[in-house]
Amino acid sequence: MDQGSQTIKGKDRYKSGVMEYRKMGYWEPDYEPKETDVIACFRITPQDGVDPIEAAAAVAGESSTATWTVVWTDRLTAAEKYRAKAYRVDQVPNTDDQYFAYIAYDLDLFENGSIANLTASIIGNVFGFKPLKGLRLEDMRLPTAYVKTFQGPATGIVVERERLDKFGRPLLGATVKPKLGLSGRNYGRVVYEALKGGLDFTKDDENINSQPFMDWRERFLYCMEAVNKAQAATGEIKGTYLNVTAATMEDMYERAEFARDLGSNIIMIDLVIGWTAMQSMAKWARRNNMILHLHRAGHSTYTRQKTHGVSFRVIAKWARLAGVDHIHAGTVVGKLEGDPATTKGYYDICRDEFTHRKLENGIFFDQPWASLNKMMPVASGGIHAGQMHQLLDLLGDDTVLQFGGGTIGHPMGIAAGATANRVALECMVLARNEGRDIVNEGPEILQEAARSCTPLQQALETWKDVTFNYTSTDSPDYAVTATASV
């Protein structure tokens, strides 16, 4: 969409009263973004009768320096520099009322190393702006100069693998089920059986903190006893994600320190704690040589719908800057939202040294990562051993595959469920390394392995008909049609 700048110049720019945003300098179609600019792509849905150019200029204004009327104090600032600039508006393919608005922000508008400050502008009051039916932050380009003000993941994929001494395959985990109600002793039994059976990790779920049925100290003690026994029994390094999420930072630090003192190598936090708490825990994890796992609890309240909110690809970028080592990023084949092409984009953001623009995966900008450590994506939610060929093909080696119900729901017990998943993974990795077509031969490869592994045979029989084939609500706009889950 092309429309010339209508910015009012000179003294008329500062006349008292209300002025269109585009005339105030927030629409600059000839602007060439600088390498140091923060660039955002918004999906805007204007109210009926609202011009999309004016809507884009309004988003630029309300997310940077503007208010609803002209203020004389603009003349006391370098307004030309600090005003965000909407410089391009494109109609969203296959829509009549949605537009992609590209907006550039001067780097000086943001505090170094602060996700809280960045988000206060980019997704602040502007998301309640009445002239818009909907507003969604689709993607951001964060310049190298800004990226380098963040610590990034404290451990990273390479060092995590070195600590675990596990290479050449995805890591295996399981969320303890039921997520609520177990006593500390029984919780620890689940952890031990799963780790002894072949998993690398177990984890707390997002809402297990410190409830009447199980105090957090009790859980930590029983879990670490289970980890130590499983390590002794198997000769492998094991771990369990101890959720330190709590009401205050003081409580979270206390729990994290207790986990460290018990010998844990990993702690967990929930996305709902907020960005300041997340960055604080990431700095603590770096100081204490701990892996930090982020459960994305709550994200779908604002990432799932296409017309309003924030895309998860943006959340993944912010999380990598903030410094978490793991993040739940979707499974494609599981029970939770996950378009294949879109999920591929999420995984690229986590693991790339430089993420290239790829519209078919929902990536709108090239993104340099300035040597920040890579972040391990986690696949969790409704997956089982019978999908192992799909998971390995779609998600690759550098991921954690978490089979909660797919381990603990095994008809032969928890240890058997873990063994089934470990055998399924190792037979699939071996077949891939031998050059076999695991996508098409996957079921056959699993059946071959199951002939000498009863737990795997039982898993394949139990969940053979379980699929979650629903069309995704968040597929790339530059694909021809929405892609159904595999």
Curated annotation (Swiss-Prot):
Mg(2+) binds at residues 203, 205-206. Binds 1 Mg(2+) ion per subunit. Keywords: Calvin cycle, Carbon dioxide fixation, Lyase, Magnesium, Metal-binding, Monooxygenase, Oxidoreductase. Substrate binds at residues 125, 175, 179, 296, 328, 380. It is an enzyme of class 4 (lyase). Its cofactor is Mg(2+). InterPro entries: RuBisCO, RuBisCo_large_chain_AS, RuBisCO_lsu_C, RuBisCO_lsu_C_sf, RuBisCO_lsu_fd_N, RuBisCO_lsu_N_sf, RuBisCO_lsuI. The keyword Lyase applies. Pfam families: RuBisCO_large (PF00016), RuBisCO_large_N (PF02788). GO terms for biological process: reductive pentose-phosphate cycle. It catalyses: 2 (2R)-3-phosphoglycerate + 2 H(+) = D-ribulose 1,5-bisphosphate + CO2 + H2O; D-ribulose 1,5-bisphosphate + O2 = 2-phosphoglycolate + (2R)-3-phosphoglycerate + 2 H(+). One of its GO terms (molecular function) is monooxygenase activity. The modification N6-carboxylysine is found at residue 203. The record marks 335 as: Transition state stabilizer. The active site is at residues 177, 295. The keyword Transferase does not apply. It comes from the Bacteria. Its EC number is 4.1.1.39. PANTHER family: RIBULOSE BISPHOSPHATE CARBOXYLASE, RIBULOSE BISPHOSPHATE CARBOXYLASE LARGE CHAIN. Heterohexadecamer of 8 large chains and 8 small chains. HAMAP family: RuBisCO_L_type1 (MF_01338). NCBIfam families: PRK04208.1. RuBisCO catalyzes two reactions: the carboxylation of D-ribulose 1,5-bisphosphate, the primary event in carbon dioxide fixation, as well as the oxidative fragmentation of the pentose substrate. Both reactions occur simultaneously and in competition at the same active site. The basic functional RuBisCO is composed of a large chain homodimer in a 'head-to-tail' conformation. In form I RuBisCO this homodimer is arranged in a barrel-like tetramer with the small subunits forming a tetrameric 'cap' on each end of the 'barrel'. This is Ribulose bisphosphate carboxylase large chain. The gene is cbbL.
